């Protein structure tokens, strides 16, 4: 079915008339534009609506076109009137809606009229030529749509009375433009705020406006309230005070000169403007004499110096290769033993039997950090030797804690550079246990230090020493200087540092802690739990002989920094479990005594090794030797784990309970880890 043409006559309904006007006006303007473009003609279309509003489309200046229309007599005129299209006639004058003007004095204009004059964008081309039989329905739908937004487009009657028709047209056209541009559709207050300049931007200097392209007034306001003297700082510097800002350097006439003091790298300077509040509080509490730490935002920053310091710190971190020290856990450690948090000191991860010793060690380490000497390694240093005691048994001769530090000449007379910085001169075999600790260690900074030794020479030297020793000939007096240290004694010529055991090449200076003679093959170095006698594997034993009895800490009231290997109570009625052998691979016991220099053993006393009596600590600090009936058979019955032929951690007590493993970052075969 084709379209049915409607009768061209006045539409009686106001809403339908307004909708028809909107659609046909838009189509007329569109056709006029297309005609002007396609045919290169000058067009001016002027419409005076029933709401006393002019609607105009012109491809040229309307006044100029009207001037030529009226005054240029040389231009031809082709005129048409309504009579050319039907039984209509031309009006003699302009029709002004007088009723609308009169009603505007007291009332607003009807919603339909105002709405009808403002919706001219939705018309199409076909509505200009002909109407269809659905015109009535379409007009009703358009009227319903116009009622929703009619209240927003009403013009006050007082304004319509005072404004001229041209002003009314511009006012109605402005409402149409608001629909097209979402920025103009804002509420009046928001639109006014958007047009008004920012007072903070006006008050800022041009230099600050270049630094900050996007205005953030809420950040600036809060920052100015908190820091009135530093209101010129940009919000980026305010939001991230931790990062060094190069913007603040522009406020200085010239940056202060960079002065590198001799102790610059030992205690680097931190610029005040790049400090965090937490760092600032720490510097103020430590009594720093920096004059710029009163307010870290007010003082100007020296960005160049900060960048140099960060570069130096980064290079120092790269040069110091971290080594992870892993300690095997043991369930017999003291529950109140303090775990220190000093990763750069080997003494901080030592096996402390009690919390008092640990706290005292930490205090001593902090006070002596400037001297770079570990208090534990300086308290008792020197090699251990096997000597015959008064009772005819073999004992371990421990170094003298009172001996001053000197060069180690290899004969055991001078006790400098003892390889055990774990606590009071006792090796890890005699130490109590501690919870599982993984601590990064820093290598020693001594040039030509012990970690730069020849690995093949050390391995060959150890093999020769272990071949000379036999498990059955341990009763002989054999100096354990090289056997226990695993290195030539003359290597250490300088004092021990507190940076932990040297790393970087194997074998380490503590590699002997995990090595001892095998019961059957004396030329092969094995783990300490393999050094049990042949009687430990007797068929009558019900328990597996490969493990060790619980290692307990000793009660030592006279010296809080000593690290004991057995936990003997103050009474002399200890059971056999407390009198059993410690983690020494020879099933030996300690003869402990106290001295004023925090040494576990004195120079004049002996420590028994094979079947000797356990020394029992009393509250007075003296020691009493008591006979120990625990032989290999008795010790085997006290063991409750697997045999010593496997070092795996699968029992309650492991022989590796006091051992450390250093895992370096160097991936080079066997050198990627070292046992300490």
Swiss-Prot record:
InterPro entries: MEF2-like_N (IPR033896), TF_MADSbox (IPR002100), TF_MADSbox_sf (IPR036879). One of its GO terms (biological process) is regulation of G1 to G0 transition. Residues 103-120, 260-276, 296-312, 472-506, 621-631 have a biased composition (Polar residues). Residues 103-156, 173-192, 202-318, 330-424, 472-514, 532-631 are annotated as: Disordered. Its main location: nucleus. One of its GO terms (cellular component) is nucleus. Residues 3-57 form the MADS-box domain. Residues 284-295, 334-359, 368-381, 399-417, 539-604 have a biased composition (Low complexity). Keywords: DNA-binding, Nucleus, Phosphoprotein, Transcription, Transcription regulation. It is found in: Nucleus. Gene3D superfamilies: Transcription factor, MADS-box (3.40.1810.10). One of its GO terms (molecular function) is protein dimerization activity. The modification Phosphoserine is found at residues 120, 164, 374, 377. Residues 58-87 bind DNA. Residues 121-134 have a biased composition (Acidic residues). Residues 173-183 have a biased composition (Basic and acidic residues). Phosphorylated by SLT2. Belongs to the MEF2 family. May function as a transcription factor downstream of MPK1 that is subject to activation by the MPK1 mitogen-activated protein kinase pathway. Binds to the DNA sequence 5'-CTA[TA](4)TAG-3'. At least some RML1 target genes are involved in cell wall biosynthesis. PANTHER family: MADS BOX PROTEIN, MYOCYTE-SPECIFIC ENHANCER FACTOR 2. Present with 736 molecules/cell in log phase SD medium. Can heterodimerize with SPM1. Interacts with KDX1 and SLT2. This is Transcription factor RLM1. It comes from Saccharomyces cerevisiae (strain ATCC 204508 / S288c). The gene is RLM1.
């Amino acid at each position: 079915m084709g379209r049915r043409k409607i009768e061209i006559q006045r539409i009686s309904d106001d809403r339908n008339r307004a909708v028809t006007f909107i659609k046909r006006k838009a189509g007329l303007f569109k056709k006029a534009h297309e005609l002007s473009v396609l045919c290169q003609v000058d067009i001016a279309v002027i419409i005076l609506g029933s709401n006393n509003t002019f609607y105009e489309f012109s491809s040229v200046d309307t006044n100029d076109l009207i001037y030529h229309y009226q005054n240029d007599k040389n231009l031809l005129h082709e005129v048409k009137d309504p009579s050319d299209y039907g039984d209509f006639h031309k009006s003699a004058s302009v029709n002004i809606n007088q009723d609308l003007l009169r009603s505007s004095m007291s009332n607003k204009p009807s919603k339909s009229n105002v709405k009808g004059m403002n919706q001219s964008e939705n018309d199409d081309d076909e509505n200009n030529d002909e109407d269809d039989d659905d015109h009535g329905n379409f007009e009703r739908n358009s009227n319903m749509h116009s009622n929703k937004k009619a209240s927003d487009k009403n013009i006050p009657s007082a304004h319509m009375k005072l404004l001229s028709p041209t002003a009314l047209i511009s006012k109605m056209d402005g409402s149409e433009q608001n629909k097209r541009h979402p920025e103009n559709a804002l509420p009046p207050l928001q639109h006014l705020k958007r047009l008004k300049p920012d007072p903070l931007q006006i008050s800022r200097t041009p230099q600050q406006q270049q630094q900050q392209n996007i205005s953030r007034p809420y950040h600036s306001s809060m920052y100015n309230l908190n820091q009135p003297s530093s209101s010129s700082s940009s919000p980026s510097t305010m939001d991230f005070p931790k990062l060094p800002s190069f913007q603040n350097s522009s406020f200085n006439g010239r940056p202060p000169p960079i002065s590198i003091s001799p102790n610059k790298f030992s205690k680097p300077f931190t610029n005040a403007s790049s400090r965090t509040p937490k760092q600032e509080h720490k510097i103020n509490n430590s009594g720093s004499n920096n004059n710029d730490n009163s307010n870290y935002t007010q003082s100007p920053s020296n960005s160049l110096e900060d960048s140099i310091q960060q570069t130096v710190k980064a290079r120092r971190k790269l040069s110091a290769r971290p080594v992870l020290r892993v300690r095997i856990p043991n369930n017999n450690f003291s529950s109140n033993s303090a775990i220190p948090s000093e990763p750069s000191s080997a003494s901080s991860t030592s096996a402390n039997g009690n919390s008092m010793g640990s706290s005292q060690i930490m205090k001593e380490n902090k006070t002596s950090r400037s001297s770079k000497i570990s208090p534990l390694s300086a308290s008792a240093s020197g090699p251990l030797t096997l000597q015959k005691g008064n009772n005819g048994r073999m004992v371990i001769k421990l170094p003298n804690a009172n001996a001053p530090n000197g060069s180690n000449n290899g004969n055991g007379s001078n006790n400098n550079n003892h390889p055990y910085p774990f606590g009071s001169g006792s090796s890890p075999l005699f130490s109590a246990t501690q919870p599982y600790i993984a601590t990064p260690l820093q290598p020693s900074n001594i040039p030509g230090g012990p970690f730069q030794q020849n690995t093949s020479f050390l391995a060959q030297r150890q093999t020769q020493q272990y071949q000379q020793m036999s498990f059955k000939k341990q009763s002989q007096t054999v100096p354990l200087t090289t056997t226990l240290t695993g290195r030539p004694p003359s290597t250490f010529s300088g004092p021990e540092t507190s940076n932990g055991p040297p790393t970087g090449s194997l074998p380490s200076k503590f590699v002997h802690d995990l090595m001892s003679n095998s019961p059957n093959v004396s030329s092969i170095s094995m783990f300490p739990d393999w050094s049990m006698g042949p009687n430990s594997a007797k068929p009558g034993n019900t328990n597996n002989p490969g493990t060790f009895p619980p290692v307990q800490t000793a009660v030592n009231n006279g010296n809080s920094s000593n690290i004991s290997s057995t936990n003997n109570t103050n009474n002399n009625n200890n059971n056999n479990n407390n009198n059993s052998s410690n983690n020494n691979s020879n099933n030996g016991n300690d003869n402990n005594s106290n001295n004023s220099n925090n040494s576990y053993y004195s120079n004049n006393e002996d420590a028994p090794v094979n079947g000797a009596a356990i020394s029992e600590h009393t509250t007075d600090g003296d020691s009493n030797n008591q006979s120990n009936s625990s032989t290999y058979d008795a010790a085997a019955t006290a063991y409750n784990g697997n045999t010593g032929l496997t070092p795996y951690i699968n029992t309650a007590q492991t022989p590796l309970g006091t051992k450390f493993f250093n895992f370096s970052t160097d991936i080079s075969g066997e050198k990627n880890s070292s046992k300490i």
